């Protein structure tokens, strides 16, 4: 069975400004509550400050996936790091400060 990949876009506002990453991603397993959102991007574009290898605190943000928008609660934290230079992968993990009103799911 072939994997199905979808476009995903994350926009985050931090004290450094607005950063956006968009591209194709595939799901990562998650367990804690509220569950962190973990994404691994390939064929991506970055707008704004590149947060690679940085941890950040979210002022506001949203996830756009398959035509739907999911808010990232204020005061959430996250990390953005280069995963693999050979395949040019970036992992973004967001730890919601509380359970979002509309929970992101695949």
UniProtKB/Swiss-Prot annotation:
One of its GO terms (biological process) is cell adhesion. InterPro entries: Dicty_CAD (IPR008601). It comes from the Eukaryota. Belongs to the csb family. This is Uncharacterized protein csb family protein DDB_G0271196. It comes from Dictyostelium discoideum (Social amoeba).
